[in-house]
């Protein structure tokens, strides 16, 4: 630091001889002097003979004052000089992915107008100064992938405008400061992974109501129980608590519900759902998770001596045993009579209507419903449900209301007809009618549909209820009014115009799809594979938030007799929009290792799906990569080149081989947004890695999602 100050003073002494540079210009020259290696020559045009520094690479000025210094990914090697403190108007400092080392100068924290400090991917070390609390306007703090140590200073809570806090992959330790959750109510991204943090997770963590993506506490040394307040985080947030020292029952509240066991692995002391380990010895927690277990039940781990004593003291007399047996026999007979009565009612029910259910059955629907999903065990394979079977506690409609509703066809496919249904109360639903077979496979159908119904995530289309009979199977979803991604990108026959998606909208869609797939792959009960991901299966909800649909549909259709398991589903739930169409112009480029794939099957299917192999999550990664290419290029997966046709992956490969500029690959509708070029290139590189012909070389969806989360979306 002393050396940099001497250099700075020496430069100031020569100000009249050298040029008219102001103090900020000389501060930047001191920064250049502190860089010992500049292999790309990124600082070559930083010359003392210039009138000001505003034309230098990486420097942005406003009214001749430096407001931004951004020199990422240049492999610069050096340290930060204290002279940076003279950049009094600096708002943004981005030095990510270089080779800077040493501690951060205290003067850096005196830049009270600083809004973003992005230093990830360097070798900075030392502890964070208490002076950091002076950065009251700071919104982005990314210090990940460095060598920082010590604890988070208490003063960091004064940076209460933070939206991004990423200190992952350092050597930070100690507990999180008290009041952590209450201080950062504006926080949208939190990543504390791969450090040495210890102590308990703050009880006020649920106050982070604006969090998005993944709240990552993984690979630390957090102890104690999981605070129930953690469930108060938005449902869209993934909570990663893996590989800590947490113990006790997992609270079944809010964002912690419907999480698969992978979110909690590496914590040997945790118990209760979704883990298989029951909470022995945590009586209060056990009752919280299982409300029907009385609090005076003895613990299961009582010693054998006590157990034997209890067995002796609780023995039953012969008369009591005989009475119990007689009651059981009477009960079985009563159940048999009830079942016979209900079965006769089932056979009397006749169904045919606008979905295949006859109008006269409306009057008898309530009589037929003897077995509801929440009232009894599954009946025989030939059972017929005469009412809607809800998969969501909020389902408040029945079959009779559904039959009275106005309905019209939205589309048809090989897996049945899709209707838009508007109930009398205004609720709009999408109803898919499956085949008329599968009468002997009810249990199989029920198992599948209930598993799908448990998937609750903002980026997964919700299956609300179903209906089953020998002649009819209906799947009932929330209606999504903005159509699907295929229509949003390319229009459909009969459309005259279509409003092009902006880059921000496309990026939001990319992130949402990735987030939904991460949920399917890592947080769903069985680590599912979608297997049929394509734009027509991506519905567009409010604020351009995507919803992945048709998960498990091909399997259900096969059970219902509507299709072969090899037929790919093609959901056609679309909006009542104005007729639109887009001309297919389009174009872009960048380099990486990948191999094109083309076959007579779906362009979205990975090459290995042509072999009879077990479904893999890497299939979905490949399909996602094709969708990314489609969003960037604005082209269909089959590209017309002259009189011939080429698949999109091969077309991009040709553009790279011919070293075409990015604008030749980019959708022309995105051309005016030239300032987003770095983001587009970053996404293109992700897409290319996703469509690698080798499944092992494709990234996981978690890695893809985390990478995309680093890219800001306008309006977020």
UniProtKB/Swiss-Prot annotation:
Which reaction is this enzyme known to catalyze?
L-seryl-[protein] + ATP = O-phospho-L-seryl-[protein] + ADP + H(+); L-threonyl-[protein] + ATP = O-phospho-L-threonyl-[protein] + ADP + H(+)
One GO BP annotation is: zygote asymmetric cell division
UniProt-listed InterPro entries:
At_inactive_RLKs, Kinase-like_dom_sf, Leu-rich_rpt, Leu-rich_rpt_typical-subtyp, LRR_dom_sf, LRR_N_plant-typ, Prot_kinase_dom, Ser/Thr_kinase_AS
LRR repeats located where? Answer: 87-111, 113-135, 136-159, 160-183, 185-208, 210-233, 234-258
Residue segments, region Disordered:
575-598, 695-716
Its PTM note reads: Autophosphorylated. The kinase activity is activated by the binding of CAM1 and/or GB1.
Which top-level group of life is the source organism from? Eukaryota
Chief location category:
membrane
Record domain Protein kinase: where: 404-711
Entry's Gene Ontology cellular component terms: chloroplast; chloroplast stroma; plant-type cell wall; plasma membrane; pollen tube; secretory vesicle
Biased-composition ranges, Basic and acidic residues, are 695-709
As stated in the Swiss-Prot or TrEMBL entry, residues carrying the post-translational modification Phosphoserine are 406, 616
Question: How would you describe this protein's topology in the membrane?
Answer: Single-pass membrane protein
* Gene3D superfamilies assigned: Phosphorylase Kinase, domain 1 (3.30.200.20), Ribonuclease Inhibitor (3.80.10.10), Transferase(Phosphotransferase) domain 1 (1.10.510.10)
Q: What is known of its domains?
A: The CaMBD domain (358-373) is required for calmodulin binding.
Function field:
Receptor protein kinase acting as an integrator for intracellular calcium and heterotrimeric G protein signaling with extracellular signals during early zygote development. Involved in modulating the asymmetric division of zygote and the cell fate determination of its daughter cells. Required for effector-triggered immunity (e.g. Pseudomonas syringae effector HopZ1a) via an activation triggered by SZE1, BKN2/SZE2 and ZED1, thus being essential for resistance against P.syringae pv. tomato DC3000 expressing HopZ1a.
Q: What quaternary structure, including any partners, is listed in this protein's UniProt entry? A: Part of an in vivo complex containing ZAR1, CAM1 and GB1. Interacts (via CaMBD domain) with calmodulins CAM1 and CML8 in a calcium independent manner. Interacts (via GBeta-binding domain) with GB1. Component of an immune signaling complex made of, at least, SZE1, BKN2/SZE2, ZAR1 and ZED1. Binds directly to SZE1 and SZE2 at the plasma membrane.
Descriptive protein name: Receptor protein kinase-like protein ZAR1
Query: What is the native source organism of this protein?
Result: Arabidopsis thaliana
The gene is ZAR1
């Amino acid at each position: 630091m002393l050396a940099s100050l001497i250099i700075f003073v020496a430069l100031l002494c020569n100000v009249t001889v050298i040029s008219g540079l102001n103090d900020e210009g000389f501060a930047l020259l001191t920064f250049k002097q502190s860089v010992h290696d500049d292999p790309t020559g990124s600082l070559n045009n930083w010359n003392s003979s210039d009138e000001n520094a505003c034309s230098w690479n990486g420097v942005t000025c406003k009214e001749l004052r430096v407001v931004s210094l951004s020199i990422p990914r240049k492999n610069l090697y050096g340290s930060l000089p204290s002279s940076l403190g003279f950049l009094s108007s600096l708002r943004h400092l981005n030095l990510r992915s270089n080779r800077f080392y040493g501690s951060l100068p205290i003067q850096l924290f005196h830049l009270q107008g600083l809004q973003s400090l992005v230093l990830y991917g360097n070798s900075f070390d030392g502890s964070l100064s208490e002076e950091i609390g002076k950065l009251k306007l700071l919104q982005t703090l990314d210090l990940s992938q460095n060598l920082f140590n010590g604890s988070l200073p208490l003063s960091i809570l004064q940076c209460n405008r933070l939206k991004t806090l990423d200190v992952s992959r350092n050597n930070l330790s100690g507990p999180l400061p008290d009041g952590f959750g209450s201080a950062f109510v504006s926080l949208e991204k939190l990543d504390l992974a791969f450090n040495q943090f210890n102590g308990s997770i703050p009880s006020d963590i649920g106050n982070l109501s604006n969090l998005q993506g993944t709240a990552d506490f993984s690979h630390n040394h957090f102890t104690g129980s999981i605070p129930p307040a953690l469930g108060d985080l938005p449902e869209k947030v993934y909570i990663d608590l893996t590989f800590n020292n947490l113990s006790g029952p997992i609270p079944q509240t809010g964002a912690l519900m419907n999480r698969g066991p992978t979110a909690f692995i590496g914590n040997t002391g945790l118990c209760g759902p979704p883990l298989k380990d029951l909470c022995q010895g945590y009586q209060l927690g056990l009752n919280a998770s299982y409300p029907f277990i009385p609090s005076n039940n003895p613990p299961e781990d009582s010693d054998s001596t006590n157990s034997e004593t209890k067995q002796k003291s609780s023995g039953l007399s012969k008369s009591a045993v005989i009475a119990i047996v007689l009651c059981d026999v009477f009960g079985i007979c009563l159940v048999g009579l009830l079942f016979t009565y209900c079965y006769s009612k089932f056979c009397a029910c006749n169904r045919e209507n606008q979905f295949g259910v006859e109008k006269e059955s409306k009057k008898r629907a309530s009589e037929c419903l003897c077995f509801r999903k929440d009232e009894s065990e599954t009946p025989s394979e030939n059972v017929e449900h005469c009412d809607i079977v809800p998969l969501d506690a909020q389902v408040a409609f029945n079959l009779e209301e559904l039959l009275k509703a106005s309905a019209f066809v939205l589309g048809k496919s090989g897996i049945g007809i899709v209707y838009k249904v508007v109930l009398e109360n205004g609720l709009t639903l999408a109803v898919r009618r499956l085949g008329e077979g599968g009468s002997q496979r009810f249990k199989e159908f029920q198992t599948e549909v209930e598993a799908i119904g448990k998937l609750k995530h903002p980026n997964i289309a919700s299956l609300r209820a179903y209906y089953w009979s020998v002649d009819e199977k209906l799947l009932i979803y929330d209606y999504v009014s903005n159509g699907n991604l295929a229509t949003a990108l390319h229009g459909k026959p009969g459309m005259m115009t279509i409003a092009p998606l902006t880059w921000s909208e496309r990026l939001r869609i990319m992130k949402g799809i990735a987030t939904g797939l991460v949920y399917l792959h890592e947080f769903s009960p069985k680590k599912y594979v979608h297997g049929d991901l394509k734009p027509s299966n991506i519905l567009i909800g409010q604020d351009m938030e995507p919803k992945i649909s048709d998960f498990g549909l091909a399997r259900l259709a096969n059970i219902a007799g509507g299709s072969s398991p090899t037929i790919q589903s093609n959901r056609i739930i679309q909006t009542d929009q104005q007729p639109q169409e887009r001309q297919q112009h389009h174009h872009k480029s960048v380099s990486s290792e990948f191999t094109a794939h083309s076959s007579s099957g779906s362009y979205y299917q990975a090459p290995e799906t042509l072999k009879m192999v077990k479904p893999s999550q890497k299939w979905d990664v490949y399909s996602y990569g094709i969708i990314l290419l489609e969003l960037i290029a604005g082209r269909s997966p089959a590209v017309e080149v002259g009189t011939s046709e080429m698949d999109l992956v091969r077309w991009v490969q040709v553009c790279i081989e011919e070293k075409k500029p990015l604008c030749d690959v980019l959708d022309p509708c995105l051309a005016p947004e030239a300032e987003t070029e770095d983001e587009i290139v970053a996404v293109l590189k992700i897409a290319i890695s996703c469509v690698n012909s080798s499944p092992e070389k494709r990234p996981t969806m978690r890695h893809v999602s985390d990478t995309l989360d680093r890219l800001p979306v306008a309006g977020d």
